[in-house]
């Protein structure tokens, strides 16, 4: 593969911003073609680091999906508003570029008129920058400590010692939990750092930031796990094509069950493609990880889950704490059963070294190993 060009990635992002900043015009689709061409080329390049290649490939497809939404499917300047801001198409070019940059960056829609009604923890508009700084520093330190503790497990000989699908149940659960904890807290560290930079620079306000992951106690169904507890960084770009397909192409009534299930299956299909592209970069094989199967079956199980819950409501069963507890057990059991092939291939491709920090506060305080030896892939 040819070497990766970060300049072309930056160019792709700039073109996406410009496509949202220019006033509505029929020729905007040309920018979409250029963005898709750039991203397709970059997907066939490599940095030499499999973990970085995986992340870059995923983000390239996210940019492509976002460009499809904002250029082809949505009249962004007329349909999307930030905090009731109106008339952006009449604003100056500089103001439209600022607006478009914030739109492209706002993957979760916080503060926009398309924000999902699921975010329960957010900063008050009255929160000072100093208070935000202190709270986010504590939050970031907590996330780092959890990653550090998971690193201790990743460095042990029992961690990820064999393919995940063939592991004894207890070690399979331990490996999945380690991956889940490390991944969620690592992503949270990155978003916390980004929030600090933007708020302290005056680019954004404390109220523009919410935790990247929802409450785990809300994940008592598979649907709620994906829709509330898991990150929502790709929610819009995965759902917009399905909404267009269901209402504009198939002519289904918005909000009807047929339309919603078309959107559900389309979103998980695109999620499968997104992750399969990353897996291909690592394994050079579209099928080894079973990525498409894993993500597409999530839609199937959610529809079955909806049916069971519908029957329960018809029987007069009320939602109580013990039913939620049973739901949590069901959700955990489902992922322990369904994710070993995909997750195992992902971990083996990236190596367990990707879940071992290069520096460790815990080991440093415990035995002076501030920079422990590198873990073998």
From Swiss-Prot:
Does the keyword field hold Transmembrane helix? yes
A GO molecular-function descriptor:
O-acyltransferase activity
Alphabetized UniProt keyword annotations: Acyltransferase, Membrane, Signal, Transferase, Transmembrane, Transmembrane helix
Which GO BP terms apply? terpenoid biosynthetic process
Q: Name one GO cellular component term.
A: membrane
Question: Membrane-spanning regions, if any?
Answer: 29-49, 56-76, 176-196, 258-278
Where does the signal sequence lie?
A: 1-27
Gene name for this UniProt entry: ple2
Q: What is the protein name for this chain?
A: Acetyltransferase ple2
Subcellular location, record wording: Membrane
Instruction: Return the EC number.
Output: 2.3.1.-
Q: In which pathway does it act?
A: Secondary metabolite biosynthesis; terpenoid biosynthesis
Provide the function of this protein.
Acetyltransferase; part of the gene cluster that mediates the biosynthesis of pleuromutilin, a tricyclic diterpene showing antibacterial properties. The geranylgeranyl diphosphate (GGPP) synthase ple4 catalyzes the first step in pleuromutilin biosynthesis. GGPP is then substrate of the premutilin synthase (PS) ple3 to yield premutilin. Premutilin synthase is a bifunctional enzyme composed of the fusion of a class II diterpene cyclase (DTC) and a class I diterpene synthase (DTS), with the corresponding domains and active sites containing characteristic aspartate-rich motifs.
